A protein has these predicted regions:
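An amphipathic, basic-hydrophobic helix/alpha-beta surface used to engage anionic
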Residues: 2-52, 84, 94-96, 104, ...
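A conditional alpha-helix N-cap/helix-loop micro-motif detector
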Residues: 20, 74-78, 166
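Short, electropositive alpha-helical surface patch
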Residues: 49-65, 175-179
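Von Willebrand factor
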Residues: 57-93, 105-106, 126-127
Length: 208
């Protein structure tokens, strides 16, 4: 997910920077296992697709693209990426979806993909996205639509409504993913992401 909502962060790094680091680690791990690796960059459309291949040269190309990629659009539509993935990847694969999952509905293509492939959702988020500090009247701009509104954060009801709306969306995603057989890893900016990844894969190894 290379949409504009990734350009948010309040503790040392943006969400997109965190996603980039994780994508690079996952790609490097494929070298050791001699796995094929591909990548789909998406916003509200598929921006670029690098088909799966083996080899260090190919992996390094993917990492260069991940580090330097500049999307042409700002919005997010995960369903577009999933539909494209379903159409171009025929063999059963492990698919890591790195996104904040702030998107238009995507349940239908997710269900289709999860029946054929092994999906892992890495929800990249920042803790400040789920809170609104009491600092008076502040401008808030949607990174994807560029719409700007002013919010009176001194109003307790407004702060509570903001938090509730945000948590409702997060909980909806957390409920949907396991219901369709998709594993979820929650990773926040400013926190160690190596340990959650290691714990996740260790847990998977035990299940198998």
């Amino acid at each position: 997910d290379v949409s504009a909502s990734g350009n948010f962060g309040t503790k040392d790094q943006f969400k997109r920077e965190l996603a980039t680091e994780i994508a690079a680690i996952l790609a490097f791990s494929a070298i050791k296992n001699n796995d094929k690796v591909g990548v789909i960059f998406f916003t509200d459309k598929v921006e670029e697709f690098i088909p799966p291949k083996k080899g260090k040269k190919h992996i390094l190309r993917i990492i260069r693209e991940v580090l330097a990629f500049q999307p042409s659009r700002k919005k997010t539509d995960i369903s577009e990426a999933l539909e494209y993935f379903n159409s171009v990847i025929k063999r059963r694969s492990i698919c890591f979806i790195l996104s904040d999952f702030i998107s238009a509905p995507f349940e239908k293509p997710l269900r289709i993909a999860s029946k054929k492939h092994d999906l892992v959702a890495l929800r990249i988020h920042d803790r400040r996205e789920s809170s609104l500090p009491n600092v008076g009247l502040v401008p808030i701009q949607d990174a994807e639509t560029e719409e700007m509104i002013f919010i009176d954060t001194s109003n307790k009801k407004i702060r509570l409504d903001f938090v509730k709306n945000r948590l409702d969306k997060i909980n909806a995603v957390k409920k949907l993913l396991p219901n369709v057989g998709v594993d979820l890893i929650d990773i926040s900016t400013g926190n160690d992401y190596i340990k959650p990844l290691i714990n996740f894969f260790k847990g998977r190894g035990k299940k198998r």
